[in-house]
Amino acid sequence: MKNKSDDYVIRVLNSPQAIDAVQWNKLLALQEPASELNPFMRHEYLAAMQASGSAVPNTGWTPHFIALYNGTELVGVCALYLKSHSYGEYVFDWAWANAYQQHGLAYYPKALVASPFTPAPGPRLLAKDAATRVQLVKALMAWCDSEKLSSLHVLFGSDADIAACAEAGLMLRHTVQFHWKNVVPTLVAARTALPPEGAVLARGGPSLQTAAPTPVAARTAQPPTQTQFKDFEDFLGSLNQEKRKKIRQERRKVSEAGVVFRAIRGADMSSADWDFFYRCYERTYIEHGNAPYLSRNFFELMATQMPENWLMFVAEREDRPIACSLIALSSGEQNGQKTAYGRYWGALERVDCLHFEACYYQPLQWCIAHGFDSFEGGAQGEHKMARALLPVKTTSAHWLAHPSFADAVERFLAREEEGIAGYMEALERRNPFKPTAS
């Protein structure tokens, strides 16, 4: 499908392979923060989702990528999927779907702009500038309207994405994640790190002028004068006594069980390493009665096309691998933020506190040793606060075609935002760090 919007040609494509990878990644590199290339929006990552059979029509993800061209130049693009369910999204709208069904209306298929199965904040609407990003949102909404879809959802977007969605009249919704920063936070810094409350936007109108998206700097960012931790002991020394003692106890349990760890960068991972990881990854899903979202072939593609973006921790006991965690790493590490993302984990044997060691303590220790600025722990999990991951808000944007349901969801989001504000305040009182002067 082709049409025109202002000076741009809009193409709707059923595969990322139909878009030049060099142009895509060049556009991704322009997004904020410019010094950090988000791995989950790389062309290779999204192409692997489809090529591996992980995010395809048979699994409920039908690709319809929206691309804006100025001549032959790609100036805007997003990964749009028609969804026949709400699995693998981590922003829960099952209640909305049920309400539609109860009133005899179809909620699915819906339009979703996201990186499949990936609840990591970052750019979703890639554009050469703010004006083009607004045009991209308009193209999205026009396409949804032409296809008579129930709704459009932009998940875990960047500040620039959210601003463009707000300008177009989409409603904003917040969720809470837990992220770690490689600096000693002051109580004042931790408080100001919380994004502004009451930022639910009306669908158009003057209220858009008073609501602000969550700033990137607000994601527990720290003053630039602060330095990184010297080592893991330095990090532990910043925690209050209770949390410091608990972490040491948990690490001791794993060590006394005879478990040791190997950290392996992507380029050094063998096929056997990836096979073992997948056994662990698959086991986690099976234990919860589910099939894994991602196929073994997806990780094979990651191993060959994006090895620099992966880090594996293998737990061994008596020279046998027993558990594994896989961490994603941002690209563009030379001039700015370097971020690690906790992604997958699994174990073939049970050891007390092994999950905490594999998924938090080993990655944090590695981040400190390698000068990484932050570690994002993924969706949900307030137990992460005891491991020094602090709460931050993430933002998604939503448009519903049905006026009455849109009004109802808007009221729901306003109530939900009040609850999140109270939740954030309660979490702040559980700050695991020592009180320090600002």
Please place each PLM-identified region on the residue numbering:
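N-acyltransferase acceptor-side catalytic subdomain
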Residues: 1-203, 208-438
